[in-house]
């Protein structure tokens, strides 16, 4: 058991599970003959959540219900309630369609691929990754900006299927039920409204190439990747049942939507606010296929993405929740990292708010939180392995704003700023 740090050891209480003393934890809860600390309670809750996740209530076809999918998304993704509901229903219907595919031959159910529209750092990639984890299917990501048409320098679209196959450990059957997330699809928009007589190999050409695998084709994939050779053997992968989720920031799309809406609503029910007075996310919710066509996506590509979910910018409160609330929250990750050095990391509420403000100013959303945390904690992470007796490191608002250094609290209860400050 851990010994008490000061005071009469006879009067010191210890957690019956981890052995930490009352001085080392925030709260110690007493039972008839045992004690449990707040850290062990939190660990127990995590274990129970993990168990619940693996035993999701499934409908008769063996697919988790939309409500259960959404509940697990809530554990990892903060906010974006509308997008989570849209995705939960779409994913449930997709895998329910696969479960019933062989049973009902009278009505053919078409596949509904998904388009995610939202600013950088709003959670598009995380949503797609979490969905694949919930359904327990292979998952891969691709960057649309690196893709080119077959025969040109760059990455062939069929390489996406190869990556999915690798994620499935070359199990073709599993790969054919996987999820593919294609990021930055807004960057492959057509360069102008009029079809060009010259080849647009990284824009419209990529959209045309993606069409084939999105609507369903048998892709010939070289097992080792790379260029195809006539002599080598290929793996045949049917993409008909692969769920494609495309995502992008679509900067400027809100102006196209706002322009379409001008003059269409009059009278007492009209929304007379200027477009910039409304949140971008609210405007994006009104997106129509014609807006995506004007943005530069070709009609066939838009037609392959019938389900559209929009995400909004994250405000201060949402970013603070992202820092602290999810199971794998950034603050929890860094606290665990410091625990490995037997040091407690304390971050004040005002400091968290300042971190959120910085991320908003940088326009990086949740994606920028880690780089901010890294820069704040760089000195403590550099110093700690060579220091003795440090019990806690405190980060306050002044530290985040660069007006002060992190505070080091030692086991003899003395405090000092970071060495070398």
Swiss-Prot record:
Q: Superkingdom of the source?
A: Bacteria
The residue ranges of the ClpX-type ZB domain are 3-56
Looking up InterPro entries in the UniProt record yields: AAA+_ATPase, ATP-dep_Clp_protease_ClpX, ATPase_AAA_core, Clp_ATPase_C, Clp_protease_ATP-bd_su_ClpX, ClpX_bact, P-loop_NTPase, Znf_CppX_C4
Per the record, its GO cellular-component terms are:
HslUV protease complex
CDD domains, alphabetically?
Answer: RecA-like_ClpX
GO BP annotations of the record are: cell division; proteolysis involved in protein catabolic process
The free-text function statement in the UniProt record for this protein reads: ATP-dependent specificity component of the Clp protease. It directs the protease to specific substrates. Can perform chaperone functions in the absence of ClpP.
Q: How does it assemble?
A: Component of the ClpX-ClpP complex. Forms a hexameric ring that, in the presence of ATP, binds to fourteen ClpP subunits assembled into a disk-like structure with a central cavity, resembling the structure of eukaryotic proteasomes.
Which NCBIfam families does the annotation name?
Answer: clpX, PRK05342.1
Q: What is this protein called?
A: ATP-dependent Clp protease ATP-binding subunit ClpX
Encoding gene (name): clpX
